[in-house]
Amino acid sequence: MGVGRSARGRGGAASGVLLALAAALLAAGSASEYDYVSFQSDIGSYQSGRFYTKPPQCVDIPVDLRLCHNVGYKKMVLPNLLEHETMAEVKQQASSWVPLLNKNCHMGTQVFLCSLFAPVCLDRPIYPCRWLCEAVRDSCEPVMQFFGFYWPEMLKCDKFPEGDVCIAMTPPNTTEASKPQGTTVCPPCDNELKSEAIIEHLCASEFALRMKIKEVKKENGDKKIVPKKKKPLKLGPIKKKELKRLVLFLKNGADCPCHQLDNLSHNFLIMGRKVKSQYLLTAIHKWDKKNKEFKNFMKRMKNHECPTFQSVFK
């Protein structure tokens, strides 16, 4: 990540000299030396003069802020650049982006998101470059659409600077455009079998079911999944009377592989969300009680409280 002057192109190289963020931090000095009066004034000019009840402060990025705890710097400013004033609010809103980050849809996803959710402590706010936003959006929105989401209004790219100092990426080879790092597998089926990752998917989904699948069909560019048996773990928007005739759809999944569906003899953990009148599959795992990570997930699920973030993608 670097701080530079924005370039209009999306290829990855910002015009002018890219400064290493570490150097910028060293130049800024210790947390106690930040000019918070100037910082507050600048934030106000960027965010329509919103009044904050707390003055800006430099705080540690907590380990449980999973989106940004390993982003490459250790401290962030509150309020952040998305108008979140408390760490609890930051965690709540940022948690919904962790599953997308795990899809590796663009190499700049974490830098872009964390420049807003957990902005680095400098003497004035620095926003991500518009071209970085556009590059991440163009690579990640197709993945988001598998889950029934679109690029949210709060991250609309024309809000960010294109002719001013801004946060940029410095790729290993800046002559090449960033490429999505994901596989051709349907994104909801490309899941890591780790208890933490399954919990994250559970929290990002509206409902969860233990399911035996009767058949899988192609329909209007989607995969249509017809259950044989199902047991609700988390009903969310599903009404009990709808449960009997429930069918699921793997959005845009007609032609991408979902290896879990190659063998329907197993029970599955199915997670999803309702979009309009459809119930979309957002994650699928083989129901395997012999697997250590799956067993750990089942134990944690009983007492785990998920944050609420329904408003994030509006």
From Swiss-Prot:
GO CC entries: cell surface; cytosol; extracellular space; plasma membrane
GO biological process, one term: BMP signaling pathway
Glycosylation positions in this chain: 173
GO molecular function terms noted in the UniProt entry: cysteine-type endopeptidase activity; frizzled binding; heparin binding; identical protein binding; Wnt-protein binding
SUPFAM superfamilies the record matches: Frizzled cysteine-rich domain (SSF63501), TIMP-like (SSF50242)
Matches recorded under InterPro entries: Frizzled/SFRP, Frizzled_dom, Frizzled_dom_sf, Netrin_domain, Netrin_module_non-TIMP, SFRP1_CRD, TIMP-like_OB-fold
Subcellular location: Secreted
Sorted UniProt keywords: Developmental protein, Differentiation, Disulfide bond, Glycoprotein, Secreted, Signal, Wnt signaling pathway
Tissue-by-tissue expression: Highly expressed in kidney and embryonic heart. Also highly expressed in the eye, where it is principally localized to the ciliary body and the lens epithelium. Weaker expression in heart, lung and brain. In the brain, is expressed exclusively in the choroid plexus.
Superkingdom to which the source organism belongs: Eukaryota
UniProt KW Ribosomal protein keyword: no
Disulfide bridge partners, by residue number: 58-121, 68-114, 105-140, 129-166, 133-157, 186-256, 189-258, 203-306
Signal peptide boundaries: 1-31
Tagged with keyword Calcium: no
Pfam families: Fz (PF01392), NTR (PF01759)
Residues in FZ domain copies: 53-169
UniProt domain NTR: residue ranges: 186-306
Comment field on protein domains: The FZ domain is involved in binding with Wnt ligands.
Assembly description: Interacts with WNT8, WNT1, WNT2, WNT4 and FRZD6. Interacts with MYOC.
Entry similarity comment: Belongs to the secreted frizzled-related protein (sFRP) family.
Function: Soluble frizzled-related proteins (sFRPS) function as modulators of Wnt signaling through direct interaction with Wnts. They have a role in regulating cell growth and differentiation in specific cell types. SFRP1 decreases intracellular beta-catenin levels. Has antiproliferative effects on vascular cells, in vitro and in vivo, and can induce, in vivo, an angiogenic response. In vascular cell cycle, delays the G1 phase and entry into the S phase. In kidney development, inhibits tubule formation and bud growth in metanephroi. Inhibits WNT1/WNT4-mediated TCF-dependent transcription.
Name of the featured protein: Secreted frizzled-related protein 1
Organism encoding this protein: Mus musculus
